[in-house]
Amino acid sequence: MRIGILGGTFDPIHLGHINPALDVKQQLHLDQIWLMPNHIPPHKNTTVVSTHHRLEMVKLVCQQYPEFKLCDIEINRDTPSYSVTTLTLLTQQYPDDEFFFIMGMDSFVQLPLWYQWQSLFNLCHIALCQRPGWAMDTNSEMTKELLFRQATADYLDSPSHAKNGRIFTINSQLVDISSTEIRQQLAQNIDISTVLSQTTTEYIRQHQLYR
């Protein structure tokens, strides 16, 4: 199978996560998208709601969207969520599958700061979501990386194509809102149902989260 991996704190999960993931699936003809909530050490206290609530909201989104599947490999671990460690485990557990790590341009340009970031290309492809008309700095280290590794969806049609190491740029109508902004608006009792899935909106109301 061809599987997209989208990680995040999902505090809460919103259409800014969901829509680009659906675009990736459609444009690269993937079989599934796995939503992977990050592990947050209790002492860091960097999320607003509990791990339980974050996990339940993702489960509900997976029920609403059959294209999605919950991947709990990180959230059940007691160690930091290094992407390269997670993808190493996934490729060992699912050696016949092909993984596409989904990220935005803002994360991609910061990739050299990630733990063993270059090893990612030995484990997966990268599906890079960009807003139409968005351009990288031509002198950036990651611009050179992108030009070297860039491929189109046609590349995947070849039976002998490599299962890792390529970057696919995805044109996506990104929802310009963050989880932080959503939490702030919820705290002010502002209706934000247009940027949340129906199941997430109902869950937040039912459990009175982010108040």
Swiss-Prot record:
Its EC number is 2.7.7.18. It comes from the Bacteria. GO terms for biological process: NAD biosynthetic process. It catalyses: nicotinate beta-D-ribonucleotide + ATP + H(+) = deamido-NAD(+) + diphosphate. Signal peptide: none annotated. Pathway: Cofactor biosynthesis; NAD(+) biosynthesis; deamido-NAD(+) from nicotinate D-ribonucleotide: step 1/1. It is an enzyme of class 2 (transferase). The keyword NAD applies. Keywords: ATP-binding, NAD, Nucleotide-binding, Nucleotidyltransferase, Pyridine nucleotide biosynthesis, Transferase. GO terms for molecular function: ATP binding; nicotinate-nucleotide adenylyltransferase activity. CDD domains: NMNAT. NCBIfam families: cyt_tran_rel, nicotinate (nicotinamide) nucleotide adenylyltransferase, PRK00071.1-1, PRK00071.1-3. Catalyzes the reversible adenylation of nicotinate mononucleotide (NaMN) to nicotinic acid adenine dinucleotide (NaAD). HAMAP family: NaMN_adenylyltr. Belongs to the NadD family. This is Probable nicotinate-nucleotide adenylyltransferase. It comes from Shewanella frigidimarina (strain NCIMB 400).
